[in-house]
Swiss-Prot record:
This protein's name: Fluoride-specific ion channel FluC
Membrane topology: Multi-pass membrane protein
Transmembrane stretches, start-end: 1-21, 37-57, 69-89, 99-119
Gene that this polypeptide is encoded by: fluC
Source organism superkingdom: Bacteria
Binding site for Na(+): 76, 79
Similarity annotation: Belongs to the fluoride channel Fluc/FEX (TC 1.A.43) family.
InterPro entries in the cross-refs: FluC
Gene source species: Pseudomonas putida (strain GB-1)
GO biological process, one term: cellular detoxification of fluoride
Function: Fluoride-specific ion channel. Important for reducing fluoride concentration in the cell, thus reducing its toxicity.
Single GO term (MF): metal ion binding
Main location: membrane
GO cellular component: plasma membrane
Reactions performed catalytically: fluoride(in) = fluoride(out)
């Protein structure tokens, strides 16, 4: 159990640091598009969860520490629904309602498509 907790913790730290670095990079280079960092990590996370889920379906004997460390830890730390929600509210409050609606649509539909694409990549 200690190894499982350590794997999830290490994955969470790595995912969180990558999300933090992405958000800071976007803020420094595209300050008007603050939401782009959240969109990027969420779409990449969706692609990766589909890919990993598909790979682990074909390799059910992969250690639970690896599976949980990557899916629960790393991807849990990388992706964020709360930041997506805050970004959407900020866009709406600043009067950018069409952009907020587009961002929401791209996030949800794009996330579903990315997850499907990741899973599909394991079926070849």
């Amino acid at each position: 159990m200690i190894a499982l907790i350590a794997a999830v913790s290490a994955g969470g730290v790595a995912g969180t640091l990558l999300r933090f670095a992405t958000a800071n990079w976007v803020a420094a280079h595209w300050p008007r598009h603050f939401y782009a960092g959240t969109l990027a990590v969420n779409l990449v996370g969706c692609l990766l969860i589909g890919l990993l889920y598909g790979l682990f379906l074909h390799k059910p004997l992969a250690p639970i520490e690896l599976r949980a460390g990557l899916i629960v830890g790393f991807l849990g730390g990388l992706t964020t629904f709360s930041s997506f929600s805050l970004d959407t509210v900020r866009l709406m409050e600043s009067g950018q309602v069409p952009l907020a609606l587009g961002y929401t649509s791209i996030s949800v539909v794009g996330g579903l498509l990315a997850t499907w694409a990741g899973l599909s990549l394991t079926r070849f």
